[in-house]
Structure formats: structure tokens, C-alpha cells
């Protein structure tokens, strides 16, 4: 029988400090214990391990009334789920747009931004904003987390609040760097070349009643990848296109909530494994 046990030992959230009224920073520390018996989930053996560490430090600087800079660095150790170490989580310029027609509000993020198109993508690396140490792998697959979490490019977000409805519209276009562990997730351990994400194009819409007891959403993703083999490689040059549709829903009660995301994904690949390989 496969057993997987996760124990969260504690969470420390550091208070916000401000040396000036236009600058603030804070951080968090999370440490857990895990044990996997008869499986390779998180760990590769049956031992109890502390390979569930998350440390983050973020800051915010107000440049002007409607322009600011926000950034976060974090250290992650998730066992065998993803590459251990420090990474730049996000660093972007936030421009709050002037009042728009119809009482809409808007903002633009330029730089490395967080993915706003799925329920838990924005706060994926903030332990106290989610309810489990390991998110559902059908949507938030850990092996590809760094590329799915955010992108380098531009993102727009528009919101509208009325007496009966709350609307949110998001659009983004950019790309992410693909490290070796993510390359191995896509092409296997025998791949020795380099893989590049040409672009990732995303859009989403969310609706809530004014009571905020429900949240319904839909999102779309389209992305291209190219692989360049090394001189001594078991893979060949090729490319892949991924298109994903997600429908989501949440219900919020006073002391509990229910979340669901339904995903449909299409992949079109050419080359990669051998010259005539093609799949749709």
C-alpha cells in the first residue's frame, strides 16, 4: 500500500516594516515533515524528511501615486517535486490605470509577474493562503511549477464592482526560462539539449455575486516550445504547442470552502523523440 504523510510543523509570518511611508517589506517561513512509503511522492525512500521548506521575502516601493514596484525572492525545497534552491518569484512595475469608462478599474504589470489565471497560481508560494502542502497535480503539476507560476512579459487586469456583481478580466503575454529539471519533465532524463518557451498567451474571466459567496471562472492558455539537441543527445530537434482550457468554481462559507477546477488540454508535437514523430 502506498502511503504519503505530510505534517506541517509551523508557519512564521514576519510583520511588515517600513523605513519610509512609500516602502514596506515582510516575509514568511514554513517547515514541514513528510514520509512516503511505497511511492516516490516527494521523497525517494521511506524515511521521514524535512524536505518541505519555504522561505520568502518580498518588498513594495511606491514610486508615484499610481506607479509602484513589487518583488519577491524565495527559497524552496520540495523534495523531488522541483528544483531546490532560491529563485526570483516576481519583480514587476505596477501601473494603476486612471478611472476607466463604466466604473472599471485596471492595472498593468510589466516584468516578471505571477500567473493570475488559475485559482491558486498567484498565491502558490505563500503557505498560509492555501489549504494543503501539495496542490492538485492535474492543474498545478510541481515538475513544471517554475514555468507555470509566472512569466516575463506584460499582464493586464481589469475589475468592475457593482451592486450585484464583481467581474475580473485578465490577459497576459510573455515567456519563462526552462531549467533542466523542467526539460526532463517534458522530454525525459535522456534529453541533454536546451528547451525554450517561445511564448505563453493567457486570458481569464472571473465572476462573483456581490455577496462573494461564489466565484466562477474560465481561462485559456496557448504556448509554444522549441527543443535544440546537444551533439550527444538521445532527442532530436522539435517543437510543441500546448493549449489549455480551465473552468473553475469556488463556494465560500463562514468556516469552510469548496474549490474545483476542470481542465482540458491539447498538445501538438513534432520531432523531439525521433525525426518523424508527430502527435496531436
Which stretches of residues belong to each language-model region?
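Conserved positions at the start
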Residues: 153, 202, 244-246
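Sequence/structural signature of outer-membrane beta-barrel proteins
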Residues: 32-41, 74-80, 100, 115-117, ...
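Outer membrane beta-barrel
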Residues: 22-25, 46-176, 206-210
Amino acid at each position: 500500500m502506498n502511503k504519503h504523510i505530510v505534517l506541517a510543523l509551523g508557519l512564521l509570518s514576519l510583520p511588515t516594516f517600513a523605513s519610509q511611508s512609500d516602502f514596506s517589506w515582510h516575509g514568511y517561513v514554513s517547515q514541514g515533515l513528510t514520509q512516503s512509503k511505497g511511492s516516490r511522492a516527494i521523497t525517494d525512500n521511506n524515511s521521514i524528511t524535512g524536505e518541505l521548506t519555504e522561505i520568502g521575502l518580498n518588498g513594495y516601493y511606491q514610486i508615484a501615486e499610481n506607479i509602484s514596484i513589487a518583488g519577491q525572492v524565495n527559497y524552496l525545497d520540495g523534495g523531488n517535486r522541483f528544483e531546490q534552491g532560491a529563485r526570483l518569484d516576481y519583480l514587476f512595475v505596477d501601473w494603476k490605470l486612471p478611472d476607466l469608462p463604466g466604473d472599471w478599474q485596471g492595472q498593468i504589470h510589466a516584468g516578471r509577474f505571477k500567473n493570475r489565471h488559475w485559482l491558486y497560481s498567484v498565491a502558490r508560494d505563500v503557505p498560509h493562503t492555501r489549504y494543503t502542502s501539495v496542490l492538485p497535480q492535474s492543474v498545478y503539476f510541481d515538475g513544471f511549477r517554475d514555468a507555470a507560476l509566472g512569466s516575463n512579459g506584460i499582464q493586464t487586469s481589469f475589475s468592475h464592482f457593482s451592486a450585484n456583481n464583481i467581474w475580473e478580466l485578465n490577459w497576459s503575454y510573455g515567456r519563462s526560462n526552462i531549467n533542466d529539471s523542467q526539460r526532463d519533465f517534458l522530454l525525459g532524463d535522456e534529453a541533454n539539449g536546451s528547451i525554450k518557451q517561445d511564448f505563453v498567451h493567457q486570458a481569464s474571466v472571473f465572476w462573483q455575486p456581490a455577496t462573494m459567496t461564489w466565484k466562477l471562472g474560465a481561462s485559456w492558455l496557448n504556448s509554444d516550445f522549441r527543443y535544440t539537441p546537444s551533439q550527444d543527445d538521445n532527442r532530436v530537434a522539435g517543437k510543441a504547442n500546448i493549449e489549455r482550457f480551465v473552468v473553475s468554481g469556488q463556494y465560500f462559507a463562514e468556516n469552510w470552502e469548496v474549490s474545483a477546477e476542470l481542465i482540458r488540454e491539447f498538445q501538438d508535437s513534432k520531432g523531439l523523440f525521433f525525426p518523424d514523430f508527430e502527435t496531436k
